[in-house]
């Protein structure tokens, strides 16, 4: 779920763009975040995910395949970063997510029995699960498509932020804001699904475009440092301290941090209750120094079309004609947008 910084981000630090504005940039994408979005959004009207003849879920593969092609056709260079072992501090959040999914599954079944299609779809989306088999097959598909991916030792967003700080990527891509706390110079949101999107439970659509958020303009406008932003995030609540510190919203958290200045003083001021200040200091240190790796190579290779056909058509019953048309697009995008092309290094703002 991540930290919610949306209310604090000033207009000066964010802007909506068309996909083509990101052409030439390497983007380190939070793979789990993207795959969950595909599993949630790519469903039939009753909420059922896409399935092959054996009943295996394929929504994630469909989203990954076609969306990646859309990105590279625009000249974007996606690098998918996969989560490793979650830190022990995240166990409470993981357990809570499992509980919520189990509850959503039960409500989904009741809605189906009652013939409530809209309710069934809503709860089916909430119950989406990403299994280890899905993750491994996603990596296999990316290999076949010639797309690079990186295995993070722990949090994918931390690894993606590290790659962006090093200059190996221009920005991180995720719906969550955590990568800003991890120090990513830029965050791009709304990459998995763009265009018109129906609001859940309402007969209303909104236009979704990619959104760029830059860390330095954000910090400058708020008048704080990255370390202080981490303290704000902890007060609001992160995956490592769900719910945050009682009584603090975005404005009150920012006010306290600016008043006390030193993040250690901020965390020490928290009343001993649900979260001990010593524990919160560990969370703070994790955002500053998460486990990351330099064991990766960003290389875009010629697609192995036969392997893609094997995975999608032979194994998972994808429509062969549609896959062939997509492979033609992928091959053309590789030749014209990826092969031998240098990445853009210029800054977006400024």
From Swiss-Prot:
DNA damage recorded as keyword: yes
SUPFAM superfamilies per UniProt: 5' to 3' exonuclease, C-terminal subdomain (SSF47807), PIN domain-like (SSF88723)
Record SMART domains: HhH2 (SM00279), XPGI (SM00484), XPGN (SM00485)
Sequence segments annotated as region (I-domain): 119-261
Region (N-domain): 1-101
Residues binding Mg(2+) 2, per UniProt: 176, 178, 239
Keyword Hydrolase set for record: yes
Physiological role: Structure-specific nuclease with 5'-flap endonuclease and 5'-3' exonuclease activities involved in DNA replication and repair. During DNA replication, cleaves the 5'-overhanging flap structure that is generated by displacement synthesis when DNA polymerase encounters the 5'-end of a downstream Okazaki fragment. Binds the unpaired 3'-DNA end and kinks the DNA to facilitate 5' cleavage specificity. Cleaves one nucleotide into the double-stranded DNA from the junction in flap DNA, leaving a nick for ligation. Also involved in the base excision repair (BER) pathway.
Family to which the UniProt record says this protein belongs: Belongs to the XPG/RAD2 endonuclease family. FEN1 subfamily.
UniProt-recorded name of the protein: Flap endonuclease 1
């Amino acid at each position: 779920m991540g930290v919610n910084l949306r209310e604090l981000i000033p207009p000066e630090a964010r802007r909506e763009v068309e996909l083509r504005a990101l052409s030439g940039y390497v983007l380190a994408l939070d793979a789990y975040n993207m795959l969950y979005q595909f599993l949630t959004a790519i469903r039939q009207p009753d909420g059922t995910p896409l399935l092959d003849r054996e009943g295996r879920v394929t929504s994630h593969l469909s989203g990954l395949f076609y969306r990646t092609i859309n990105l590279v056709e625009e000249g974007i260079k996606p690098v998918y970063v996969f989560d490793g072992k979650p830190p022990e501090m995240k166990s409470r959040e993981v357990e809570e997510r499992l509980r919520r999914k189990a509850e959503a599954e039960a409500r989904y079944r009741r809605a189906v029995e009652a013939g409530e299609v809209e309710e069934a779809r809503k709860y089916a989306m909430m119950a989406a699960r990403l299994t280890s088999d899905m993750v491994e097959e996603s990596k296999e598909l990316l290999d076949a498509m010639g797309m690079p991916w990186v295995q993070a030792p722990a949090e994918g967003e931390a690894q993606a932020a590290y790659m962006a700080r090093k200059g190996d990527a221009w920005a991180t891509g995720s719906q969550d804001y955590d990568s800003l706390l991890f120090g990513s110079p830029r965050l791009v949101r709304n990459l998995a699904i763009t265009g018109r999107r129906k609001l859940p439970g309402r007969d209303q659509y909104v236009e979704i475009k990619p959104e760029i958020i830059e860390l330095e303009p954000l910090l400058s406008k708020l008048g704080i440092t990255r370390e202080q932003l981490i303290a704000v995030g902890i007060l609001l609540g992160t995956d490592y301290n769900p719910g945050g510190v009682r009584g603090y919203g975005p404005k009150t958290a920012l006010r306290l941090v600016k008043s006390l200045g030193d993040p250690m003083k901020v965390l020490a001021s928290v009343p001993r209750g649900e979260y001990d200040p010593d524990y919160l200091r560990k969370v703070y240190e994790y955002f500053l120094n998460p486990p990351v790796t330099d064991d990766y190579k960003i290389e875009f290779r010629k697609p192995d079309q036969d392997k893609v056909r094997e995975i999608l058509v032979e194994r998972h019953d994808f429509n062969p004609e549609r896959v062939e048309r997509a492979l033609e697009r992928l091959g053309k995008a590789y030749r014209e947008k990826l092969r031998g092309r240098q990445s853009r290094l210029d800054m977006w703002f400024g």
